[in-house]
Amino acid sequence: MSALKDRLADTGYGLGWGLLCRLPESWVRWAFQFAGDIAWRRQGHGVQLLEANLRRVIGPQPSGQELRQLSRDAMRSYARYWLEVFRLPVITKERLLDGTLGIGESALHAILASGRGVVAALPHMGNFDAAGAWIVSTGVGKFTTVAERLKPESVYLRFVAFRESLGFEVLPASGSNSRFGVLAQRLRAGGLVCLPSDRDVTGGGIEVEFFGEKARMMGGPAALAVQTGAALMPVTLWYEGDYWAVHIHQEIPVPDGGDRREKVAAMTQQVAGVFEAGIAAHPADWHMLQRVFVADLDPERLAAAEAAAEDTAEDDGGRP
């Protein structure tokens, strides 16, 4: 059964990239919105987690109707993301440039032009892939990111090929102890690294205050900035009607005091603050169908992941 599911998943993604980009966009947009509505009505595990996360965003005691409407809007936004993923290979550079509302890109370009690297930390908002294709189109050139190893492997390889076609260099998010070193090399060479950071996927993340609760986020972007001298710049994304919106925020400086871990923790907390403001302004475009808040995490799995992360950090020179 597992092998059959893997083949079906691979076939589905293959059809997505091979067929959907050839159909009229209005048809496909309607179909994906309809699919998003169906997923929302079914109230599966992912939608339940989405609503648990959004409940923190919109207040301590949101009405059931308010939360349900927001989660429906969020699932439609998420469906739009997937529609655009399958159609991005045929979207022209001109449409990307004309269809993106960019804020703060001049500061990013200025830092890169000075020869200094930039590590951009992003939440799961809007459309990461469209934003990446846009920044490549503005003249930045190729940048480096990581991708979770999806199963089956064939689907992961399709995603890597897709993102490479947009101008990304893609490293696996797991299975390679040299990943941090490669990212550091790119930054020391004056390159751009873009990392999704609003969910801890390693068990070794940083605990932050987020919407009034404890949450765990990736400390890698801040650690890379501290180690390499690169600029740490949070980025928030959302949809503005038919447009993509990309806000590249001001650099978060490395604190003067404290040891390395304290600096990384303080900078990650500042990133979380930027994410919080961006998500609060555009909650329907935060596509977080996973556990983020510590209260929602399984204690035993969290403890095991933390132990594994500590072992990895020791093997990797103490890097988070």
PLM features: what roles do these ranges have?
Residues 1-122, 156, 165-167, 315-316:
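Membrane-anchoring hydrophobic helices of lipid-metabolizing enzymes
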Residues 2-4, 8, 39-42, 60, ...:
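Non-catalytic C-terminal accessory region of glycerolipid acyltransferases
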Residues 16, 51, 132, 159, ...:
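Generic structural marker for isolated residues within well-ordered, non-membrane alpha-helices
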Residues 20-23, 127-133, 153, 183-198:
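Short, composition-biased local secondary-structure segments
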Residues 98-101, 125, 152, 173-177, ...:
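A conditional alpha-helix N-cap/helix-loop micro-motif detector
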Residues 105-109, 132, 136, 159-160, ...:
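Short amphipathic alpha-helical segments and helix-helix/interface helices
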Residues 114-175, 189, 203-206, 210:
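Catalytic core of membrane glycerolipid acyltransferases/transacylases, capturing the structured
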